[in-house]
Amino acid sequence: GLPQGLADASTSLDRSRRAPAAGAAESERALHKVLVLDPAAGTGTFLSAVIRLIHARVAAGGDSGAWSDYVSNHLLPRVFGFELLMAPYAVAHMKLGLQLIDTGHDFRSPDRIRVLLTNALEGPHELAELPPFSGWPAEDADAAGERDRAPSIMVVLGNPPYSIFGQTPPGPWIRGLLDDYKTGLNERKLNLDDAFIKFIRLGQWHIERRGAGVLAFVVSNTFLDGITHRRMRES
């Protein structure tokens, strides 16, 4: 079990073994077992709550003097957010940075808040060089050779947008993932184009890549009993 929950700082070894054609041999690295992601972070409200909870857990352990080292080595490397718009992205960085300073963290040069200015629904390709996301594109990891992933728990949380109105059409990557929710459906109108459904599918993909996880979104409840959402529920 993980008695510290989101504050768990344990790591496990991740091994990658690529085929000779890929030009690389076996490699290994330590990955944290508990990873946290808000794929529509906005101004960082949910990530702020995560930091507040983790700080309380660490402080309850009676070693508050180690907090700054914990942030550098075990919080910032495994808590992530994605945000598409510049204004909330900037606010999130300021909010989370000030919050960590208020808790007593002393920012060092390598430290960075990992809220990324990116469209989470465009796929993992932009994140390929950023641990723990490196190697996530399936066509790289799966086709090139075998990969024994370190067991970890992916916590995907937040309050993604609900509606399709005013949005640009989804890209091919997320459209391909949504096909799993449409398999065998014969209805004329599927009602599977809302943004929150795309984010649920995205969260499912992240968890499947890691082997276990928790999906905690504030979303519309229409998928709970919608006729055309039955494949989504099964999945």
Question: How would you label these PLM feature ranges?
Answer:
Residues 1-234:
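SAM-dependent methyltransferase catalytic region
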